[in-house]
Every structure is written in C-alpha cells, then in structure tokens.
C-alpha cells in the first residue's frame, strides 16, 4: 500500500504509450489526470483486474495490436493444420467447437506464439480434416479471426477456448510457421504489450477457470462464431496482407462487418454474434468483401494467398505496429494541424481591424515629427500617410518633417488625436520667476524710474540733446557724427532717476527704433525746428503709437535763425498730435541742445508724465528684462547691454536669453562703475553669457544653471527643426522658380560688426538692394573681428567680407591675401551700402543700346562684276561710318539689316561721310538695292546696368 508509482513509470514498464494507459485507467474507473498522476498499489491491482475492458479499448483504438495477438494464436493451429486437409468451412467450425472445451488452459500460453500466416483460407480446411499444406495455412487465419468474436462475448475465456481448439487440432506444425510466430509476437508486444501482461495476470489469478465455465455455457454460439470468424478472418488477413495501406479501410469494413455473412455459409447462429462483435473486432480486421471473394472462388483466394503471404512476412518484421499507431494518432495530429492552419490567419485579420482604446489613440509629439515616426506611432503604413498628404497637395517623403498643425490634421483623418508635449519653457520661466520674498500685491511693488527713448530723424540732434542732459559728448565718438548704436544711460534729476535709450535715426536702424519703442515708457520725439517733419520722424511716430507709448515732442535747434516751431506743430497735427495750447494733449517743449536751453523743463515734463503713468515694479522677483544691445569683446567675451524690467538682477544669477545662457559674472553701468545688483529700469552691461544674444530678445533669471541650459537647448533644437522644415518644403511652382533663378546673379557677403544691432542694420540695408536680376545673399553674420574661419568660408563660397567697426586678425588677413578673398572695412553705413550697390551692378551684364548715326538716300545703283551692286547715295542727316551697322528700308518696311561692306567717296575709301555729301556704298552679302531706298546708319553701345 505504501508503494506508489506514477502513470508514466507504469506505462514504461508495460511498454505502452501514456495516452493509452490513461484511457485504460479511465475505463477502469481510476482517476488519473495526466502522465504525472500518482497511482497506488490498489489502483494498479484494479487496473490488472479489469483486463477485458482494456482489451476492448485496445480493439477500438489499436486495431493492429489486437489482430496480431489473434494471429499469433492462428499459427498454433497452423502447426496442426498440415495434417488436416478439409476444405469445407462447416466442418472446420464443428471441429473447432468440439476441441475448444477440451483444452482451454493451453491456448493462453499459445496466444503470444501465434503469428499471422499468409494463407488464411487454408486454415478452415485444416480444422475440418488434414489436407495439403497450403490449405492448412488458410484455416489458421480463420481461427485467428474467430477469436475476436469469442472475445466480444466473453473477453478472455473465448480467446482461451480458441487457443485450446487450435492445440487439439494441430498434429504437426511447419518450421517456417514457427519462425513467423515470434516475429508476430514481437510486434504485438510493441503495440499492445499491456494486453499480454493483463492476460498473464488473469491466468495466474485463476480467471482461466471462469473462462472455461463461460465457454462451456456458450459452446454452440462459439462454434457458429468460429465458423463465421474463420472465414472472415482468413479473408480479412489476406486483404490486410496484400494491401497494407488498406488498414484504414479495415475500420470501415469492421463497421460494415454484418455484410460478411452474405458470403459465409453458416450464417444462422453466428451471424448475430458477428454483429455484436463488429464494433470491437471490426477495428482489428479488414473489411468483409475480401473474405467473400475467398469463399466464392479459390483462385482469388490463392492469389490473395501468395500476395498476402509475402506481405505478411514484411509486416511481421515490426512495421505493423508502427502503422497501427500511425492510423490511431496521426490522423488526429493532421486534423489539429489543419485546424491550427485555419485558425492562425483569422486572428491576424482581427488584429488589423481592431480599434484601440480612446486613450491609446492620443499621440504625444513635440513641435515637429517626421512622417515615418508619426506612422509608426499610429500603427499605420507610411505610404498611407504619404498618400493622404499628397491628396492634400503636399509632396512629402517618409523623412519629411511635419509641424504640429499638419500632424494634427493628418492624424484626424485616421481617427487619432495629437497632443503637443513639447518642452513648455513658459511654465518653467513662470515658475522660476516666482516671487521670492513678497507677492505681486500692491504692497510688494515700488515706484521705478521711467524708461525714456529718444527718437527722431537723423541729424535732428537726438544724441546731442542726450549729451546735453548727461553732460557728455557721445556724438564726438560716433563715426560720421551719427549714432550707429543704441545706448542706455542712467541720469539722476532731483534725486530721481531717468533711464534714457538713444536710438539711431538713420533709415537703416528701423529695427533698433522698434526695439526701443517696445521697452520704453515715454518717447521723446526730437524734431529740428529748421527741417520740420521728415521720413524717420513719421516712422518714429508710428512705432510709438504701435507700442502705445505717450510722446513728448522736443523741438530742437531753436537757436537757429530759420527755426520755426509753429511749422513743426502744424505738420504734426497731420498725425493727430495737437499741442496743449491748441487744445490737444501732446506736450511740446522748445529746446536747444547746443545752448543747453530749456532742458530742465523737458525733464520736468518727463517726470510729470511718469507720475501720471504710475510706474511700479516688484524688486523681490527674479530678474526679467530685454537685451538692448550685444557685442563681442576680445577680453571679456560676449557683452550684453540689458534693461531690467522686473525684479533684481544680481551677480551669480543664472540667466537665459535667446539661444544662449550663463551666469552673471560682472555688471557695469554706462559710466563703467561695477554694480552688485540692478533693480527695475536699470540699464547695465552683463558678461558671462555663452554667446552674443540678439538685440531685442528678452532675458530671464532662473533658479539654476541647469534650467537655463535646458531652456537654451530646447530653443536651439526648435530653431534647427524649423529651419529643416522650412528648407524641405518646396512646391512645383517654387521648383520652377528656382530653375529660372539659375540665370540670376548672386553676390554673397559675410558681415562682421562690433555689436549685434549694427549687424542687423547692415544686413537689412544690403538685402534691400536685391533685385530680380541680381540678388544679395548674406551667408553669415556674427559679432567680433574677422578671423580665419570667416576667410575660409568666404573662399569656399566666393563671398566678400564686410567689416563694420571691426578689423581682421593678422592671420586672417594673410590667409585672405593668399586665397584672394576681398575684405572691406567700413565705419559709416552709407559707404557700405554704396560699395555693395556698385559691386552688384558690376555683376550685371551691360545693357546694349542703339545709337542713331544718320540716314542716306539711294539715288543710283551700279552693278560691278565680282563686286555686286554699288549704291550711289546722298547723306540726308547725321553721318555714315565705315564699320557701322545699317538697316535697309523700302516703303517704310525694313528689308534687310547688317553691316556696310565698303564706303567710298570719289573712288577713295572713306572713314566717314558727313551730312550733305554724296558717297558710294555696298552692303555685306546683299545686292537687292533699288533707287529710292532709305538706309539708316546706327551702332550698338554698351551701357552699365544699374540696380
């Protein structure tokens, strides 16, 4: 009881497959779920006690195994068959029935020895009476078939009785038959070794006695069954042996086994048993038509004998068991494979049609994404997206970048949503600009100095006025006496501070004036009393109104004798600027910067206007402001002039401006004094940035340098993506335009200046010179001196270098001379613009213009051999030159145009003939000259093309 065994171990001992053993266990009522299930000794004994059920199961599942066992019993009969020679099937049946009860125990041991021998039909004759050897082989087969029928009624006892019958009948067995028996036994062991073990166990326990009793009770039935079975079995074996592939048909024949009685003589008693046994024995034995043929004709049986005998030998080698297993298991495997093959494509189609959840149909992208990446995230083929974009009129490729708006529209076509998850620098800057000590409430804000921008037309005295206020001389330091930089200054007036921004008045510095108007609180519009309103004056008014900044008009140069302030006021009324004394709200102050008159009144008006505006700021926040100007200093690096608008900027604060970031290393005011901190409305020069920021950009002080770097890196990446997106977009029209531009001349320039604002001014002024015939392309701009990299770039791109208020390094100058690069230096923007205009005009091809010289009238023609027609002419106007071009006109229609071949006067060659003289001339390669024709004389001259 204590010893247990697993199913697979028991199967190995019994030589049976795990599946077969599991089926036997289930039929025996033993619960075993898998090959790893544990069986007790009681279960094993229970399995041994139910051999009949196991045999029946084996007959259904493994037909080959059951057939072989019974065939093994047949060879024992075959041993007795050689002496018997009866051919009648009825006698065979009776003999078997009589001998069965006599020897029931012996057949059990003989069953494993029985082998299926080729001639089944002869066995019937052997049982009835001794006959020739070939016939004896046939009855052996018949007995084997009879056994399964007996087993159907009584499982093992029937087999035992049959074996006994076989032993009684045989007198002597042939040696070759005995040799075949062991081979069949080996096959039966391989396929159904369990059945033999179960039979031996049953015999040892005494089941043989019970079998004898059951057999004796059913003797008449057994006899009929054996007779029928003998016939059927012999025929079945022949068919199986002759055609091994027909084993699949055996099952069919077994199901139709009731048809066999048609050809069998003893159909009375055994017929019903054959039907009962058919479901079990039908599986092991082949169909009925084969036995019918044997009964009807011996010739067919003999043919079947020979073929089946040879094949039986082949089957006896051990292939039979394998084929039986294949019949049982392989069809199921094939069906499974076919099922799997059919099912596999279905889930694939379903996955294509499946719709993801709504939350999964949201695609998060940055500002720009490529077509391929968008298709990958959407799970859509790239070609589908490209097709949709082409339908919308965009010619793209898989690597084409899409902006957020285009991606959103495209994704909506495929039922997807696009969410922009780009780095939100505004939130970061808003968080870092949080109040450190006090909130943005009224209590935390304090009055701040006003920011005043001085604007006006060039040479109207803006800088001179600021110099008079600051008591300095800025104009003297400017090249050409005009301001070319934007300056920020801090002035104290009656213990109050005013921040002044001085902007250039030249037309090239429009962007500077626009920046000055944006960051200012009050605008002082300077108008010369002797000039009145000029173009830049109008522009300054427009900038101020666009920024919503109040304007104070300063009428300058009142010291001149031709000054007329009323004319200025009258002209400004056109721009809705009416003086207060005329009932308006615009403040007018008449000043003289040269004589420093009425400056206090101007400053008083500025402070009054600032009080009205109630300018306040919170100094307790992180600093925020604007870049007024930026330049590259050789000793200090990038230097930025900043105007703090909110908060307080301190040394060491990390700041970010445009594409650059860094920590504040030093701060100095306009007088060169070092500062530790700068409050609202305080202009300072800052060093420590990674590069020169663009003038007009805003700057922010952030919490850490890491945040500053993150913001700057994000901006740089965004700029690169936008450049890539802009350069890759091109339509067919643009492509055609570019092809046409192949004939357009280009002048490439590199601009280097001392400050960023000057770079922008020079660039904008030069770009305006571009025309359809000649275009100016600025390939590089930077702040600082001209270095070797600039020269190398110019050499590679055939460009010229313009230096504005900068000089070239010694190595760069030497390299430029070697490479033949043209470097030009300027201090005044006028000179740079004029020189570039001349250079662009030099690139253009000269224009050809026709110059009229005179007219002649043909009065006579002469024909000279080998020369042609000579026209005698009279010069009616102008003159005729020998190498001039002429045009022959007849009846006001141009007949011919070409050159003069010769020009003579009185047989002498003439260089020219003046008006009122006669001459003779001939045309080059043309002789159809008639009297009355008019010849026009002209020449083509080249004229320089201007922009």
Swiss-Prot record:
Comp. bias (Basic residues): 338-348
Annotated spans, G4: 556-559
InterPro entries, per database record: EF-G-like_DII (IPR053905), EFTu-like_2 (IPR004161), IF2_II (IPR044145), IF2_N (IPR006847), P-loop_NTPase (IPR027417), Small_GTP-bd (IPR005225), T_Tr_GTP-bd_dom (IPR000795), TF_IF2_bacterial-like (IPR000178)
One Pfam family matching this protein: EF-G_D2
Region feature G1, mapped onto this chain: 456-463
Region ranges (G3): 502-505
Binding site for GTP: 456-463, 502-506, 556-559
Bias (Basic and acidic residues): 215-226, 246-262, 327-337
Sequence segments annotated as region (G5): 592-594
Main location: cytoplasm
Compartments reported by the entry: Cytoplasm
Sequence segments annotated as region (G2): 481-485
First and last residue of the signal peptide: none
UniProt feature, compositional bias: Acidic residues: 139-155
Protein family membership: Belongs to the TRAFAC class translation factor GTPase superfamily. Classic translation factor GTPase family. IF-2 subfamily.
Annotated HAMAP family: IF_2_B
Protein's UniProt name: Translation initiation factor IF-2
Source organism of the structure: Syntrophotalea carbinolica (strain DSM 2380 / NBRC 103641 / GraBd1)
Highest classification ranks of the organism: Bacteria, Pseudomonadati, Thermodesulfobacteriota, Desulfuromonadia, Desulfuromonadales
């Amino acid at each position: 009881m204590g010893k247990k065994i697993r199913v697979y171990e028991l199967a190995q001992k019994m030589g049976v497959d795990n599946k077969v053993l599991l089926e036997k266990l289930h039929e025996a009522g033993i619960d075993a779920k898998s090959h790893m299930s544990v069986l007790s000794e009681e279960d094993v004994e229970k399995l041994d006690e139910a051999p009949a059920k196991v045999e029946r199961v084996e007959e259904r599942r493994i037909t080959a195994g059951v057939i072989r066992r019974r065939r093994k019993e047949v060879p024992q009969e075959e041993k007795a068959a050689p002496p018997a020679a009866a051919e009648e099937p009825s006698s065979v049946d009776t003999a078997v029935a009589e001998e069965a009860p006599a020897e029931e125990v012996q057949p059990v041991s003989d069953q494993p020895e029985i082998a299926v021998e080729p001639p089944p039909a002869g066995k019937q004759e052997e049982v009835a009476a001794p006959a020739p050897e070939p016939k004896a082989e046939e009855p052996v087969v018949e007995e084997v078939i009879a056994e399964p029928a007996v087993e159907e009624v009584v499982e093992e006892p029937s087999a035992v009785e049959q074996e006994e019958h076989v032993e009684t009948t045989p007198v002597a067995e042939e040696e070759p038959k005995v040799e075949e028996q062991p081979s069949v036994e080996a096959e039966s062991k391989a396929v159904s070794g369990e059945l033999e073990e179960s039979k031996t166990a049953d015999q040892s326990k005494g089941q043989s006695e019970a079998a004898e009793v059951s057999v004796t009770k059913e003797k008449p039935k057994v006899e009929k069954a054996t007779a029928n079975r003998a016939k059927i079995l012999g025929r079945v074996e022949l068919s199986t042996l002759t055609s091994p592939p027909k084993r699949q048909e055996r099952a069919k024949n077994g199901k139709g086994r009731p048809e066999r009685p048609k050809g069998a003589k003893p159909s009375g008693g055994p017929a019903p048993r054959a039907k009962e046994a058919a479901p079990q024995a039908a599986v092991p034995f082949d169909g009925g038509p084969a036995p019918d043929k044997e009964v009807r004709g011996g010739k067919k049986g003999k043919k079947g004998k020979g073929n089946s005998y040879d094949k039986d030998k082949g089957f006896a080698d051990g292939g039979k068991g394998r084929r039986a297993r294949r019949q049982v298991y392989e069809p199921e495997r094939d069906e499974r494979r076919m099922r799997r093959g059919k099912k596999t494509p279905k889930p694939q189609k379903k996955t294509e049609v499946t719709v993801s959840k709504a939350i999964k149909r949201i695609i998060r992208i940055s500002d720009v994404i490529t077509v391929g990446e968008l298709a990958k995230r959407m799970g859509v083929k790239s070609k589908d997206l490209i097709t949709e974009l082409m339908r919308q009129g965009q010619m793209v490729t898989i690597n084409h970048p899409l902006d957020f708006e285009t991606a959103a529209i495209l994704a909506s076509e495929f039922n997807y949503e696009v969410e922009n998850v780009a780095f939100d620098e505004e939130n970061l800057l808003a968080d870092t600009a949080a109040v450190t000590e006090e909130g943005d409430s009224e209590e935390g804000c304090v009055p701040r100095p006003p920011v005043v921008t001085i604007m006006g037309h060039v040479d109207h005295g803006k800088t001179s006025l600021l110099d008079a206020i600051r008591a300095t001389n800025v104009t003297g330091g400017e090249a050409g006496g005009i301001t070319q930089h934007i300056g920020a200054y801090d002035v104290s007036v009656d213990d109050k501070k005013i921040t002044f921004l001085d902007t250039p008045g030249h037309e090239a510095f429009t962007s500077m004036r626009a920046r000055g108007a944006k960051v200012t609180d009050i605008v002082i519009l300077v108008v010369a009393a002797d000039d009145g309103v000029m173009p830049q004056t109008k522009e300054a008014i427009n900038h101020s109104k666009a920024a919503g900044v109040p304007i104070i008009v300063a009428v300058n140069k009142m010291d001149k004798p031709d000054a007329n302030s009323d004319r200025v006021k009258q002209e400004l009324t056109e721009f809705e600027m009416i003086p207060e004394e005329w009932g308006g709200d615009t403040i007018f102050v008449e000043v003289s910067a040269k004589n420093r008159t009425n400056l206090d009144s101007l400053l008083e008006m500025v402070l009054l206007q600032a009080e009205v505006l109630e300018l306040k700021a919170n100094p307790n926040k992180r600093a925020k402001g604007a870049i007024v100007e930026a330049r590259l200093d050789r000793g200090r690096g990038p230097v930025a002039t900043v105007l703090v608008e909110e908060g307080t900027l301190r040394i060491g604060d990390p700041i970010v401006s445009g594409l650059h970031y860094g920590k504040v290393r030093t701060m100095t005011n306009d007088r060169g004094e070092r500062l530790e901190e700068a409050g609202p409305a305080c202009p300072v020069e800052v060093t420590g940035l990674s590069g020169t920021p663009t003038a007009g950009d805003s700057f922010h002080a952030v919490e850490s340098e890491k945040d500053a770097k993150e913001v700057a890196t994000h901006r740089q990446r965004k700029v690169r993506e936008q450049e890539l997106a802009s350069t890759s977009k091109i339509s067919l029209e643009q492509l055609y335009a570019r092809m046409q531009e192949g004939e357009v001349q280009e002048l490439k320039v590199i601009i280097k200046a001392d400050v960023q604002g000057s770079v922008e001014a020079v660039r904008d002024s030069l770009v305006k010179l571009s025309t359809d015939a000649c275009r100016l392309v600025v390939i590089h701009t930077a702040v600082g001196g001209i270095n070797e990299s600039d020269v190398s770039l110019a050499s590679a791109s055939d460009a010229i270098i313009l230096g504005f208020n900068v000089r070239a390094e010694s190595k760069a100058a030497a390299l430029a001379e070697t490479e033949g690069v043209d470097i030009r230096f300027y201090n005044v923007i006028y000179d740079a613009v004029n020189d570039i205009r001349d250079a662009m005009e030099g690139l253009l091809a000269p224009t050809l213009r026709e110059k009229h010289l005179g007219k002649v009238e043909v009065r006579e023609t002469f024909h000279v051999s080998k020369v042609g027609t000579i026209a005698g002419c009279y010069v009616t106007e102008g003159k005729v030159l020998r190498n001039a071009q002429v045009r022959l006109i007849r009846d006001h229609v141009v007949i011919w145009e070409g050159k003069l071949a010769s020009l003579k006067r009185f047989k002498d060659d003439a260089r020219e003939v003046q008006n009122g003289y006669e001459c003779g001339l001939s045309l080059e390669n043309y002789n159809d000259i008639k009297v009355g024709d008019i010849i026009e004389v002209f020449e083509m001259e080249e004229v320089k093309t201007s922009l």
